[in-house]
């Protein structure tokens, strides 16, 4: 039976599965290898009852490895879930490649991850065997649940394999359309560029360290001639490459092209442009192998590294060249005028745990399904709000023991990520500063390191999302307390969210000083996550927007701005609406439109 983290699926309003793995009856066929690899097993993280681990296959030969297959067995430990491979067996275990990581080029490696239970033992390091392995070795690297080093973004991240697909985090734009009229693609479709020289597909890759990475482009070229591409990293400042993309014989026949590139530490914009008038082939996906990488931030592109083509007519082009300016749903719905103003969406309440699973084991996905469908149709990113919070969580958690709550938290995160794997950003933990609304139930489940454990789970099940520690007005109140809390999480978190409610009366200099201090001490990308100014006096609201918004937008370490509502009478803070229900703007909205939203 085949097991894959991507196989968890839950239709709306039905009983969720309580098993950790979903098994589907897919026969495993014999696989042929034309080379072999060194196979290693590494413990990433270990806690009192469980662990996470990576298995890495490194091709040290001169020929490619195709369709790998490996096995391992524990004495006492047992696997409970895994990602980036297809799994079978109940000890011994078997793992085979997924559609996008089945070929390992000479000198390159792939990794997949797993989580398990120790069953009273320590975390074991079993021998990895199989037709793909020329030597079976185990890693002596062990770590505890303490903060990981900067070489790994989190203890349970899958460091060396990243898949970027259309309409998901890290996919920035296509100069053309997203289509699904030719079979054989993965994900929701493929990128079909315009038939023009220079037509491009653009991705964002975040690397925790500078170095060599292997990019693999999956494509179909049903034409009679090559449709080669020019691959540019960060506008050419970090490399220009030519990618050969010969005909595949049919638009339903998919092949891969692999190229080694140099990425810099931090955000990298990767642009593949057509070198002929026919445009590019259909592009299914981009996979990245090597080092620790995750989906990058399309909205953080500077003018020096922004993409050159402006032929895209989709709404995603605004987000790819500038930081996004987003907003939330209105009374549980998305207004028809949303994308007229905003290019990022956050569900105000619909993605909170208490809204989705008010009754234990019964999910209400319908409102979120509508929001994600709208976002995909308009090619704008979604930020989930929020996984774990001391408010608006299911009341039935109060009746459970700590271990039972731990199981429920993992199932909630797992099932959300399985249903919405293209979630760009997640407020993983909300308002955890003491005195705000920390999640006591999570501390009961995981102990004092509960924040790190929740982020570990989010990394495991949503490996391509940007994971955010979000909190209330940390610009004005409990500023130092938030900094201390964020610093303590180290590399478990990807970014911090500054809600920015209640800034009325603060000067531009005061706001900038606070943001600078958070960046200087925490060193993580910043998102302004819930900005509003509540005042029925139009001029007071306008003056505060004019003071604060330029600071947010021009700050080099603020990657995006989300406002918390925009329709008068239908916002959380009274007086914070920006347009009337009929669309008439207040002065602050007119100023936003003229200076930012229509730029």
Swiss-Prot record:
The active site is at 431 (proton donor), 530 (nucleophile). It is an enzyme of class 3 (hydrolase). InterPro entries: CBD2, CBM2/CBM3_carb-bd_dom_sf, CBM2_carb-bd_dom_sf, CBM2_CS, CBM6, Galactose-bd-like_sf, GH10, GH10_AS. Gene3D superfamilies: 2.60.40.290, Galactose-binding domain-like (2.60.120.260), Glycosidases (3.20.20.80). Residues 1-37 form the signal peptide. Belongs to the glycosyl hydrolase 10 (cellulase F) family. Keywords: Carbohydrate metabolism, Cellulose degradation, Disulfide bond, Glycosidase, Hydrolase, Polysaccharide degradation, Signal, Xylan degradation. Residues 315-595 form the GH10 domain. Residues 38-136 form the CBM2 domain. It holds the Pfam family CBM_2. It comes from Cellvibrio japonicus (strain Ueda107). Residues 163-289 form the CBM6 domain. GO terms for molecular function: endo-1,4-beta-xylanase activity; polysaccharide binding. This is Endo-1,4-beta-xylanase B. Xylanase B contributes to hydrolyze hemicellulose, the major component of plant cell-walls. Its EC number is 3.2.1.8. Disulfide bonds join 39-133. It catalyses: Endohydrolysis of (1->4)-beta-D-xylosidic linkages in xylans.
